[in-house]
Amino acid sequence: MTPNTEKPILIAGGGIGGCAAALALAQKQIPSIVMEKAEEFVEIGAGIQLGPNVHKMFIKLGIEKAIEEIAFYPKNMFMNDGITGKLITQVDTGEKFRERFGAPYGVIHRGDLLDVLVKACESSNLITMLTSTEVEEFDEIENYVTVSTRDGRSLQGSALIAADGIWSKIRSKIVNDGNPIVSGHVAYRAVLSISEVPEFVK
């Protein structure tokens, strides 16, 4: 299919991936429509690590300053045995780390990261943000794609990007790779305010 550049690119999913894709397209002056099935743009979950590569992406998207204001940049990273508490290894993530990789290592809450992305998308006149818009079906018609939403609407675009998560309906129709496979690994996580963090951890 040859894309129709007169139509916007449709993006199914208004999470971190979908909003980042919309901003990247806007950098190239390509309009897009972000379709989120929820009633608002929210991200559940806990913390997420921000390595040097993603910080370089933030710079390209023009959101690095907003991220730096709310992310936390530790000077050290420790890995301890979950049962004994014994230190396994330690990584210096301070100035030497920044010099070596050209960007810092940080951590941020997934919801805070999405807030920055959503605000950046909403401030762009090239990005249309739609909530309560769940893609049910899509069809390629000549040089454009048509999507049908759960509430009966129809939208047209030059292409369709699937950013609708692990249970993606679009991916299942294109790749047909089956349901996600449980890895068998379990992670215990918690979110605390800085005032609740023990002093020795700080």
Go through the PLM ranges and name each one.
Residues 9-11, 32:
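Conserved hydrophobic helix-helix packing surfaces used for dimerization/oligomerization
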Residues 26-46:
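Glycine-rich FAD pyrophosphate-binding loop
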Residues 2-9, 16, 26, 51-195:
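Conserved N-terminal helical subregion
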Residues 194-202:
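Short, intrinsically disordered, charge-balanced linker/junction segments flanking boundaries
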Residues 15-16, 41:
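Residue-level detector of alpha-helix initiation sites
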Residues 19:
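Residues forming the Rossmann-fold NAD(P)(H) cofactor-binding site
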